[in-house]
Amino acid sequence: MSAQSARRCSWSPHLAFDAAITPNLRRWVTGDDGSLTARLVAASERFRVARLLQRPQRPLADEWQVLGQHDRTPALTREVLLICDDIPAIFAHTVVRQRHARRDWPFLRGLGERPLGGRLFVDPAVAREPFQFARLLPHHPLRQALQRVLPAMAPLPMLPARRSVFRRGDGVMLVTEVFLPDLLSRPSPGTEAIPYPRYLRTTDRSPSTHTTETKKETTR
């Protein structure tokens, strides 16, 4: 396998069959086009976001053209873990052209450890394109990034992932979500859209040092 092909995977509008993808996990991956965070909150007692990095770096080989770039010029990259009941459930990877980040996605700079969905799913100016799906093998760069944080993921032969493009003004944002083994057994709250929790919504005035952790017993 060439170094170039190792950086790519086959993205498709449909999630291919794989015996490792149980019916419950498939419901998580292919569920509604609303907020995954809202579904995770509904399926857990405690939810939080752990930011792993946010900095300019070269987009992946299968990302830069989606962003509308002519080459692999560094893009603003954000990676987080979405954690349910102290167990990582999702590895999320977001890329935005740097000039678009300043102009169309200014909230990214101070988002900290708050969920991205707190802005995307409450802003009527944001439009989302249909999902693409893939099965990520251990050699894929996103698997490599995940395995540096969670080495226990390395032996797994495949992890399902999905990605979608968000647009706001002229800005393009590509969000990829990798589904971790916790969701094999965590019951999916269904396939219909769940309203985004009001207490998770963020504004430009929210402090950048805020860390999101929700508990069922403290919410309304």
Curated annotation (Swiss-Prot):
It comes from the Bacteria. GO terms for cellular component: cytosol. The keyword Lyase applies. Residues 194-220 are annotated as: Disordered. Its EC number is 4.1.3.40. Substrate binds at R78, L116, E177. It is an enzyme of class 4 (lyase). Its main location: cytoplasm. One of its GO terms (biological process) is ubiquinone biosynthetic process. GO terms for molecular function: chorismate lyase activity. It is found in: Cytoplasm. It catalyses: chorismate = 4-hydroxybenzoate + pyruvate. The keyword Metal-binding does not apply. Pathway: Cofactor biosynthesis; ubiquinone biosynthesis. SUPFAM superfamilies: Chorismate lyase-like (SSF64288). Belongs to the UbiC family. Removes the pyruvyl group from chorismate, with concomitant aromatization of the ring, to provide 4-hydroxybenzoate (4HB) for the ubiquinone pathway. This is Probable chorismate pyruvate-lyase. It comes from Cupriavidus necator (strain ATCC 17699 / DSM 428 / KCTC 22496 / NCIMB 10442 / H16 / Stanier 337) (Ralstonia eutropha). The gene is ubiC.
